[in-house]
């Protein structure tokens, strides 16, 4: 969600801050702002809308400050306008903030009683006035320490001071924050992506820590204000992921490169020579795990639902799936034999991180499936399984979804073999099929010409449904989510067998319904459910896999056939036309495909 940047340099920083804010646009935002310090004054410019609008402001172009902070805001408290945009400033302090201050109402009441006047509707402004109040009697370190201890909720902060022209303060709790190092300048940012264009040397702050950034060095402190030492990490470059190349949108590029990312993932984990799966340094023996709980949000939750079928099919483990935002609010009965798997593309999803934190506090086994190996969820889990997809820029996840289900499938195969739930011959055959998957995905991607005209019908409809059974059900949910995210068309995914229990009442003449009916064990039953919606006037888009057998059904509006493979792998192929359907629907509507309204790539608030 919100993204922050800070730069302390020996040259003017406004251009670099604007460029870094552009790197943070993928996180999702509705307003932007910048503040620099020069000639003993804090100069602040904010605007509703895109960073481009901010960049064109003549005040920004004339900024000369060599120290500054910037922000892209996703509204949580207060309307998305220039008043509520960050930075928020008093006469002496300016703050950018990612997170939510849960006790802001009480703090504001206290501060108003002290004579402070507020300009905005945001929770962030209380931080500005708290620091200002403490600075009346304390130095910067103690003022920051006292302020942070007063705040309930989550935050990543960047702070500059009128009377301290040589430093930026950064602090975090719950929301990610990184420090970068450059020649004669240092940086602060919400993630490594915003900093990579300037440096590959980075330090991540842990919860409760804060830092003081000067041009030539950085000091780190724990929550008690005691100096601590932190490691500097050197990041590898993946610059090709930040360039659209010949594609109109990052999402189009990310859909098309899925054969490559799947091939990379298979290469990382599958030992073809020895017909085995390598999951190095797995910290538990197979008999120490009797159940698995898979936890995620949004698309990652759908990945977990997909994996549940595989774990149940290929192992004798008990499997449960939880939405991360609900997990903490139930009375969980933690068992030491349960492996908790946390799935998050960014590795910074606030609700997923909070669920991980709860499991850690209860001494549970924790494993992360992430795309960003330097992320908070990865760093705080006992074991990490990276999905090796490269940076994903489009807000609507595509290649990361296939990457997540690939790694979860690989884990289910490995545990099935180790636990002797699967014979080696079957394991070998499934590995052989898996190695062919990238080629099958590549062939399925050629479906464009059929998908483009189909998308017109979805754009003209009031809503749509996506139906699936068994392995196909989580893919139906994911397809509906993609259409909602990108085209702003109401779409719902349902188990095909549930139609008669309510959803059938919504079917009307001409309503588009996607039916996922691969030729698996559930095929005939799903076709029967399809006939029920056709009988009520629905326009059915049937997505199945190629077969010599004829489809025994009448009045199907359109049929798309993906390549054939074993049942385990068909969900990968069924996903492709759904991604393209959402993409082309949004394209024809002229919407911002890479940055859909109201959404964020990295959901760092609960």
Could you say what each language-model-derived stretch is?
Residues 49, 66-83, 271-284, 307-343, ...:
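Glycine-rich oxoanion-binding loops at beta->alpha junctions
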Residues 24-33, 98-102, 170-179, 247-251, ...:
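Conserved phosphate/anionic-ligand binding catalytic regions in large, soluble enzymes, centered on
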Residues 258-262, 266-293, 383-512, 586-606:
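Active-site phosphate/pyrophosphate-binding segments
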Residues 1-244, 248, 260-267, 271-288, ...:
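Conserved short alpha-helical segments that host acidic/polar catalytic motifs at enzyme active sites
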Residues 287-436, 516-560, 581, 589:
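Glycine-rich phosphate-binding loops that contact phosphosugars or nucleotide phosphates
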Residues 154-185, 454, 459-485, 520, ...:
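Acidic/histidine-rich
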Residues 225, 565-606:
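Generic C-terminus detector
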């Amino acid at each position: 969600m919100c993204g922050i940047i800070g730069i302390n340099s020996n040259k003017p920083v406004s251009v670099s801050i604007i460029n870094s804010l552009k790197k943070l646009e993928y996180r999702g935002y509705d307003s932007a702002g910048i503040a620099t310090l020069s000639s003993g004054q804090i100069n602040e410019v904010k605007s509703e809308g895109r960073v481009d609008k901010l960049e064109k402001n003549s005040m920004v172009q004339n900024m000369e400050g060599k120290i500054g902070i910037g922000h892209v805001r996703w509204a949580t408290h207060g309307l998305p306008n220039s008043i509520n945009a960050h930075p928020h400033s008093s006469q002496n302090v300016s703050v950018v903030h990612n997170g939510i201050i849960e006790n802001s109402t009480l703090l504001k009441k206290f501060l108003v009683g002290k004579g402070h006047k507020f300009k905005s509707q945001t929770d962030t402004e209380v931080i500005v006035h708290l620091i200002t109040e403490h600075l009346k009697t304390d130095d910067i370190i103690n003022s920051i320490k006292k302020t942070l201890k007063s705040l309930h909720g989550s935050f990543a902060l960047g702070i500059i001071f009128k009377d301290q022209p040589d430093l930026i303060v950064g602090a975090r709790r719950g929301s990610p924050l990184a420090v970068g190092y450059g020649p004669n300048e240092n940086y602060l940012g919400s993630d490594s992506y915003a900093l990579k264009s300037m440096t590959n040397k980075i330090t991540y702050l842990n919860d409760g820590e804060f830092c003081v950034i000067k041009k030539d060095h950085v000091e780190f402190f724990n929550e008690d204000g005691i100096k601590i030492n932190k490691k500097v990490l050197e990041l590898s470059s993946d610059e090709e992921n930040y360039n659209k190349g010949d594609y109109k949108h990052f999402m189009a590029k990310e859909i098309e490169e899925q054969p490559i990312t799947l091939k990379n993932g298979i290469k990382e984990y599958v030992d073809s020579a020895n017909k085995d799966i390598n999951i190095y340094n797995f910290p538990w023996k197979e008999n120490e795990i009797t159940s698995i709980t898979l936890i995620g949000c949004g698309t990652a939750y759908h990945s977990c639902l997909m994996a549940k079928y595989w774990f149940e099919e290929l192992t004798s483990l008990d499997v449960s799936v939880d939405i991360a935002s609900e997990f903490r609010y139930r009375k969980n009965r933690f068992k030491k034999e349960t492996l908790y798997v946390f799935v998050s593309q960014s590795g910074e999803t606030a609700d997923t991180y909070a669920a991980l934190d709860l499991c850690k506090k209860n001494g549970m086994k924790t494993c992360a499936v992430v795309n960003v190996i330097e992320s908070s969820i990865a760093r705080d889990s006992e074991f990490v399984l990276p999905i090796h997809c490269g940076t994903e820029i489009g807000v609507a996840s595509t290649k990361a979804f296939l990457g997540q289900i690939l790694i979860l499938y690989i884990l289910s195969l490995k545990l099935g073999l180790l636990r002797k739930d699967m014979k080696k011959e079957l394991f070998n055959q499934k590995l052989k099929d898996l190695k062919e998957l990238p080629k099958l995905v590549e062939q399925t991607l050629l479906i464009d010409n059929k998908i483009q005209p189909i998308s017109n019908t979805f754009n003209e409809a009031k809503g749509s449904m996506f139906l699936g059974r068994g392995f196909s059900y989580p893919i139906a949910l994911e397809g509906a989510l993609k259409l909602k995210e990108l085209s702003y068309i109401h779409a719902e995914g349902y188990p095909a067998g549930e139609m008669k229990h309510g959803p059938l009442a919504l079917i009307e003449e001409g309503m588009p319904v996607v039916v996922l009916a691969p030729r698996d064990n559930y095929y005939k039953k799903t076709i029967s459910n399809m006939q029920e919606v056709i009988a009520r006037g629905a326009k059915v888009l049937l997505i199945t896999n190629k077969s010599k057998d004829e489809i025994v059904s009448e009045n199907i509006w359109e049929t798309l056939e993906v390549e054939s493979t074993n049942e385990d792998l068909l969900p990968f192929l069924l996903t492709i036309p759904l991604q393209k359907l959402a993409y082309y629907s949004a394209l024809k509507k002229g919407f911002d495909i890479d940055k859909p309204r109201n959404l964020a790539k990295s959901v760092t608030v609960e």
